[in-house]
UniProtKB/Swiss-Prot annotation:
UniProt catalytic activity: tRNA(Pro) + L-proline + ATP = L-prolyl-tRNA(Pro) + AMP + diphosphate
Protein's recorded name: Proline--tRNA ligase
Enzyme class: ligase
BP GO terms, sorted: prolyl-tRNA aminoacylation
GO cellular component: cytosol
Lineage, opening ranks: Bacteria, Bacillati, Bacillota, Bacilli, Lactobacillales
EC number: 6.1.1.15
HAMAP family membership: Pro_tRNA_synth_type1
Function: Catalyzes the attachment of proline to tRNA(Pro) in a two-step reaction: proline is first activated by ATP to form Pro-AMP and then transferred to the acceptor end of tRNA(Pro). As ProRS can inadvertently accommodate and process non-cognate amino acids such as alanine and cysteine, to avoid such errors it has two additional distinct editing activities against alanine. One activity is designated as 'pretransfer' editing and involves the tRNA(Pro)-independent hydrolysis of activated Ala-AMP.
Gene that specifies this protein: proS
Domain of life (superkingdom): Bacteria
A GO molecular-function descriptor: catalytic activity, acting on a protein
């Protein structure tokens, strides 16, 4: 493919509005362009990469018997009302009316559509299991689109749905998908973790998220690709290294999720779902009597602890939430933070919001800063983190402005449901007893769910079992963020290319090292001087030979400065660069492996053989 015939609008500088490196490089390298807020056009390079990713997915899904189809993106609202999600999905749902004023939505996901299609076609257990998927654009009205393709209003997604007679059959397909996802992400060149995830608005019970790990900016060996003029990092002057470190640190670490994982085992979970090792303690302290003490102007845990000269770990934090329009009190040890997702999941609530001060006063008879669990009406549900159960003679609000209670003891002074509702902290013991918890940032690229009968119950998707009894279909759901993977791959494979000029000046610039299976082309073939007839003839000959051998070649035939061509080549990020330059008359060309920065001069007649050797282990 001639580069002059493609739309690759590279930029001289990083776009000023980009905060994460993947967004900046996709724009600068000419992969995407923003059409409006949260909506992007995928230009030829990005489209080629996405098509390669789709091919990988189709190959892996064929292995597990998944069948591709295509459902409409424009969906009737009636189905979503029937499932109950029209009201509960929230403001992210695109809602519209046709000319007859009938309600429609733009599909953010397709559980209802696939369930009803199968409901109307499948009547017997003999027709199951069934495993269907599609790859299409989805729509969510994000309040604040950001970070390029990571948070958009239109995005490309693969969503699959499996249908089963029982949970045992679902378990088999769920495991098949887990292995297929691992194969897809591995082939895509991603560093990832499969972690315990939250089902969220999808419903269901078990789920696993696949998170692409966002690399820290401190490992120079990972981020820098040195030109052959620089033997090693130690050869770069300290002042230049400091500049490079500042450049790396200037970009936000992308990934809206925090992953908690064990330092010694395979345990990994989204921070929203992560737990730590817990064991109840035996209380040895003598229970003190409740005592009301004045705590003037103390509105926070830290202020109360300082005023009473105690540790925050001996206080009870009292929060009020409104869960599906009902008040719920949440209790935590004073220095802990509530995990809203854990609390919402435990309650089985569709909506969970922090209460207003007015709502708190109606329940407690006091304002924020003085709330506590003692002497609340029996009608008020109290959910306490399990660590609260270990407290003895604690301090809590007295439900009287400006006062607190000392000598508060769980069970004696208040009754609660003790469960895990806190956010874990880095360094705590892993829940499996092996190692301690470490944190990393991650980009969610896939998610699989055991939906159970959540949608078949609400939509009446039933079959007759072997005894002729009507039973609900058991379902699984499996999603991959196709366009998100493009961002995640670039985030992990962005590099700073460092070189040294003949005058001894050090230069560095951003580019991409695309993994082979997702690179838009295999080889970037560059002619230094397109007006040199010998060089052009050699380029044409090489291009034909390479393509005959099955290589996908992008030939830079533009009449541009060689520096501009090399800069664009680094940005675009193809795995191999072949340069036809000054030695074209001798039949000599340069082959450069982008990932390592290594280069070698070879006779043009030996290019194919040399490539086979150089790429054997890549």
């Amino acid at each position: 493919m001639k580069q002059s015939k493609m739309l690759i609008p590279t930029l001289r500088e990083m776009p000023s509005d980009a905060q994460v490196i993947s967004h900046a490089l996709m724009m600068r390298a000419g992969y995407v362009r923003q059409v409006s807020a949260g909506i992007y056009a995928y230009l030829p390079l990005a489209n080629r990469t996405i098509e390669k990713l789709k091919t990988i997915m189709r190959q892996e899904f064929d292995k597990i018997g998944a069948v591709e189809m295509l459902a409409p993106a424009l969906l009737t609202a009636d189905l979503w009302r029937e499932s109950g999600r029209y009201e509960t999905y929230g403001d992210d749902l695109y809602k519209l009316k046709n000319r007859e004023s009938s309600d429609f939505i733009l599909g953010p996901t397709h559980e209802e559509t696939f369930t009803t299609l199968v409901r109307d076609a499948v009547k017997s257990y003999k027709q199951l299991p069934l495993n269907l998927y599609q790859i299409q654009a989805k729509y969510r009205d994000e309040k604040r689109p950001r970070n390029g393709l990571l948070r958009t209003r239109e995005f490309i997604m693969k969503d699959g749905y499996s249908f089963h007679q029982n949970y045992e059959d679902l378990d088999v397909t769920y495991e098949d998908y887990r292995k297929a996802y691992e194969a897809i992400f591995t082939r895509s060149g991603l560093e990832f973790k499969g972690i315990i995830g939250d089902g969220g608005a999808m419903g269901g019970k078990d789920s696993q998220e696949f998170m692409a790990i966002t690399p820290e900016r401190t490992d120079l060996n990972r981020w820098l690709v040195l030109d052959k003029s620089i033997p090693s990092l130690s050869d770069i002057p300290e002042d230049v290294l400091e500049e490079i470190k500042k450049e790396l640190a200037s970009w936000l670490i992308s990934g809206e999720d925090t992953i908690a994982y064990s330092s010694e085992s395979s345990y990994a979970a989204n921070l929203e779902m992560a737990s730590n090792a817990f064991s109840p303690t035996t209380k040895v302290a003598v229970a003190e009597d409740l005592k009301e003490v004045a705590t003037p102007d103390c509105k926070t845990i830290d202020q109360v602890a300082d005023f009473l000269n105690i540790s925050a770990e001996t206080t009870i934090k009292t929060l009020l939430f409104i869960a599906d329009e009902k008040p719920v009190v949440a209790l935590l040890v004073g220095n802990d933070q509530v995990n809203d997702v854990k609390l919402k999941n435990y309650l089985g609530a569709d909506f969970l919001d922090p209460a207003t001060e007015e709502e708190a006063f109606q329940v407690f008879g006091a304002h924020f800063g003085s709330l506590g669990p003692v002497n609340l009406p029996d009608s008020v549900r109290i959910i306490a983190d399990r660590n609260v159960q270990n407290l003895a003679n604690a301090v809590s609000g007295a439900n009287k402005d400006g006062f607190h209670l000392t000598g508060v003891n769980p069970e004696r002074d208040f009754k609660a449901e003790f469960v895990d509702i806190r956010e874990v902290k880095e360094g705590e013991a892993s829940p499996d007893g092996h190692g301690h918890l470490q944190f990393a940032r991650g980009i969610e690229v896939g998610h699989i769910f055991k939906l159970g009968t959540r949608y078949s119950d609400s939509l009446g998707a039933n079959i007759l079992d072997e005894n002729g009894k009507s039973i609900p279909i058991v379902m699984g759901c499996y999603g991959i963020g196709v366009s998100r993977i493009l961002s995640a791959v670039i985030e992990q494979h962005a590099r700073l290319f460092v070189s040294k000029t003949p005058k001894g000046e050090y230069r560095y610039s951003w580019g991409i090292n695309f993994p082979k299976e997702l690179a838009p082309f295999d080889i970037h073939l560059i002619t230094v001087n397109t007006k040199d007839e010998e060089a052009q003839t050699l380029t044409d000959k090489l291009e034909k030979e390479l393509m005959t051998k099955g290589y996908e070649v992008l030939t830079d035939d533009r009449n541009e400065r060689v520096g501009s061509k090399f800069s664009d080549s680094d940005l675009i990020g193809l795995p191999i660069r072949i340069t036809v330059g000054k030695k074209a008359s001798e039949g000599i060309v340069e082959i450069k492996i982008k990932a390592s920065g290594d280069s070698i001069e070879v006779n043009a007649e030996n290019v194919i053989e040399t490539l086979e050797i150089l790429t054997k282990d890549h």
